[in-house]
Amino acid sequence: MKEQKWIHEGLITESLPNGMFRVRLDNVDNEDLILGYVSGRIRRSFIRILPGDRVKIEVSRYDSTRGRIIYRLRNKDSND
């Protein structure tokens, strides 16, 4: 049976070595930062993730301190 995961939206606050990022979740009551790593699909597609980007992150129900970044949301003010 596949593990159930929560999907949240968040903001990248800090870039760490080895493709890790600190992410502040939007729809969670506590303002904790969680550790996010880049999924393989994003890595293969050469999608750049920078501090200030909005992302979708998949968080395990068992360990809510880390998650996998699965999607980078488009910026509303960019022209591309």
UniProtKB/Swiss-Prot annotation:
Physiological role: One of the essential components for the initiation of protein synthesis. Stabilizes the binding of IF-2 and IF-3 on the 30S subunit to which N-formylmethionyl-tRNA(fMet) subsequently binds. Helps modulate mRNA selection, yielding the 30S pre-initiation complex (PIC). Upon addition of the 50S ribosomal subunit IF-1, IF-2 and IF-3 are released leaving the mature 70S translation initiation complex.
Main location: plastid
Superkingdom of the source species: Eukaryota
An example Gene Ontology molecular-function term: ribosome binding
Xref: InterPro entries: NA-bd_OB-fold (IPR012340), RNA-binding_domain_S1_IF1 (IPR006196), TIF_IF1 (IPR004368)
Gene expressing this chain: infA
PROSITE patterns: S1_IF1_TYPE (PS50832)
Residues of the S1-like domain: 1-74
Coiled-coil stretches: none
A GO CC term attached to the entry: cytosol
Listed transmembrane segments: none
Keywords attached to this entry: Chloroplast, Initiation factor, Plastid, Protein biosynthesis, RNA-binding, rRNA-binding
Keyword Protein biosynthesis set for record: yes
Entry's localization field: Plastid, Chloroplast
Subunit: Component of the 30S ribosomal translation pre-initiation complex which assembles on the 30S ribosome in the order IF-2 and IF-3, IF-1 and N-formylmethionyl-tRNA(fMet); mRNA recruitment can occur at any time during PIC assembly.
Residues annotated as signal peptide: none
Name of the molecule in the record: Translation initiation factor IF-1, chloroplastic
Entry's family note: Belongs to the IF-1 family.
Entry-linked CDD domains: S1_IF1
UniProt xrefs under Pfam families: eIF-1a (PF01176)
